[in-house]
């Protein structure tokens, strides 16, 4: 691997969102509202590293990846999307394709807000997933 593993994980999650979950992805971060049931974007990644003793350049990595899910149509679709994201686990074939040794994926936090300051209003939920994996640099 010649780049940060988190980029491969981000791209795998993007594929899972569109190909497996069938959700719209706001990949360019350009949409401000959505006419679809739910649109997802990845808004932040935060990572920590712990050296593995005796393994040279091995690191135990803990990646928090934050998703936003929004819709102007309804809260049910937004919450279903959050639920589906939480259900993604380390045995997902697309994550295995990355070649990254993922040890665990767990939800860390989630919240929902109802915005009424736009003409249509919308619901937005956030979800943070923690991905523990082994990396080599």
Residue ranges with predicted function:
Residues 1-33, 46-137:
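Charged, amphipathic alpha-helical segments and their flanking helix caps
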Residues 38-46:
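Low-complexity, acidic Ser/Thr/Pro/Gly-rich terminal tails and inter-domain linkers that flank the onset
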């Amino acid at each position: 691997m010649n780049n940060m593993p988190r980029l491969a994980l981000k791209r795998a999650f993007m594929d899972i969102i569109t190909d497996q979950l069938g959700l719209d992805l706001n990949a360019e971060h350009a949409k401000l509202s959505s006419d679809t049931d739910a649109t997802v974007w990845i808004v932040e990644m935060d990572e920590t590293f712990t050296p593995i003793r005796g393994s040279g350049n091995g690191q135990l990595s803990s990646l928090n990846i934050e998703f936003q899910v929004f819709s102007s149509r309804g809260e049910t679709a937004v919450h279903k999307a959050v639920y589906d994201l939480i259900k993604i686990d380390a045995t997902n074939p697309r994550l295995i394709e990355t070649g990254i040794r993922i040890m665990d994926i767990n939800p860390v936090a989630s919240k929902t807000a109802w915005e009424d300051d736009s003409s249509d209003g919308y619901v937005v939920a956030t979800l943070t997933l923690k991905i523990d994996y082994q990396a080599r640099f």
